[in-house]
């Protein structure tokens, strides 16, 4: 892919790595403001070409996206003599770490943050010339990552064929998201991974916790005489008889107590309480009258 400016002046190396600053490790040979503008143009154009090749509705690689994400962009330029004039861009590879929930071979959910292949493009006229393998191998060495530990975002069939041919990646582990991981992804894993606990089924959910159950067992019983009826209820339940019949039977002492409560009238109880208060106040007056007076000399 050619441009109307000199690519060799902004990309001094065969493969240039860019981050969110869009500044190459080796400074361009032109002014920084002009170099920044040209670099942004290259990123936008190769992003559009990649989206068109993958039949995407919109580019997933652009200068603005690079500036707002912690991604790494590897740009491969053509260094052959035929492009010695202004140069040309062959393709690019975009990677970045993402937090994912991936499934292992046993179906367990694993929380991981692997390096992900987010976009990969080689110009149509320069494919099957070894440029893709050169770019991919350079990225693996620079990121210091094993090819089996990569997660790939929505790879095309052509990309999967490329990985099988050059990196012997055949067997994949089925996932529920758009990422593809290969057999060996969890082998010799160096990054931090975290297994999420499996969700309990409805049958395993208890109505009370153990502490609640212990608390319910330690509840105090009802005071006498109501505790006797409760005891009879428990005995009847344990023997298999009807609890209603057990509750209807009362002991002789309990029957007398219940009858006395029924026959006792509220106003008579109130009168008795008032008479007790009057007697108590009368005793206090009498004691105060009988108390000897103090003698003053």
UniProtKB/Swiss-Prot annotation:
Biased composition (Polar residues): 287-297
Localization per Swiss-Prot or TrEMBL: Cytoplasm; Membrane, Clathrin-coated pit; Cell junction, Focal adhesion; Cell projection, Axon
Amino-acid positions noted as binding acetyl-CoA in the UniProt annotation, renumbered to this chain: 120-133, 156-165
EC number: 2.3.1.108
MF terms (GO), sorted A to Z: L-lysine N-acetyltransferase activity, acting on acetyl phosphate as donor; tubulin N-acetyltransferase activity
Pfam annotation, one family: Acetyltransf_16
EC category name: transferase
Disordered as annotated region, ranges: 269-297
The keyword Membrane appears for this protein: yes
Residues marked Crucial for catalytic activity (site): 54
UniProt key word Zinc: no
Domain N-acetyltransferase as annotated: residue spans: 1-186
GO BP annotation list: alpha-tubulin acetylation; neuron development; regulation of microtubule cytoskeleton organization
UniProt KW keywords: Acyltransferase, Cell junction, Cell projection, Coated pit, Cytoplasm, Cytoskeleton, Membrane, Transferase
UniProt catalytic activity: L-lysyl-[alpha-tubulin] + acetyl-CoA = N(6)-acetyl-L-lysyl-[alpha-tubulin] + CoA + H(+)
GO cellular component, one term: spindle
HAMAP family in alphabetical order: mec17
Biological role: Specifically acetylates 'Lys-40' in alpha-tubulin on the lumenal side of microtubules. Promotes microtubule destabilization and accelerates microtubule dynamics; this activity may be independent of acetylation activity. Acetylates alpha-tubulin with a slow enzymatic rate, due to a catalytic site that is not optimized for acetyl transfer. Enters the microtubule through each end and diffuses quickly throughout the lumen of microtubules.
Stated family: Belongs to the acetyltransferase ATAT1 family.
Protein name, per record: Alpha-tubulin N-acetyltransferase 1
Gene for this chain: atat1
């Amino acid at each position: 892919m050619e441009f109307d400016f000199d690519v060799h002046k902004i990309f001094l190396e065969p493969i240039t790595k860019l981050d969110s600053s869009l500044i190459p490790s080796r400074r361009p040979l032109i002014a920084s403001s002009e170099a920044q503008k040209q670099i942004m143009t290259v990123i936008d154009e190769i992003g559009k070409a990649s989206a068109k090749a993958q039949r995407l509705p919109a580019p997933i690689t652009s200068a603005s996206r690079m500036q707002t994400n912690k991604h790494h962009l590897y740009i491969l330029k053509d260094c052959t003599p035929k492009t010695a004039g202004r140069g040309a861009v062959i393709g690019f590879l975009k990677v970045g770490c993402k937090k994912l929930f991936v499934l292992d071979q046993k179906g367990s959910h694993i929380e991981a943050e692997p390096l992900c292949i987010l976009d990969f493009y080689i110009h149509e006229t320069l494919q099957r010339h070894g440029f893709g393998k050169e770019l991919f191998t350079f990225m693996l060495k620079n990121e210091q990552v094993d090819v089996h530990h990569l997660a790939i975002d929505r790879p095309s069939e052509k990309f999967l064929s490329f990985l099988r041919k050059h990196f012997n990646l055949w067997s994949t582990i089925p996932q529920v998201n758009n990422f593809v991981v290969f057999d060996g992804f969890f082998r010799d894993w160096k990054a931090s991974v975290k297994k999420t606990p499996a969700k309990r089924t409805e049958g395993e959910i208890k109505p009370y916790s153990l502490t609640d159950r212990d608390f319910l067992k330690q509840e105090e019983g009802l005071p006498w005489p109501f505790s006797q009826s409760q005891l009879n209820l428990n005995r009847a339940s344990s023997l298999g008889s009807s609890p209603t019949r057990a509750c209807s039977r009362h002991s002789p002492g309990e029957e007398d107590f219940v009858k006395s409560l029924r026959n006792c009238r509220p106003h008579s109880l109130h009168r008795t309480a008032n008479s007790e208060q009057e007697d108590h106040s009368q005793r206090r007056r009498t004691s105060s009258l009988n108390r000897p007076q103090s003698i003053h000399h």
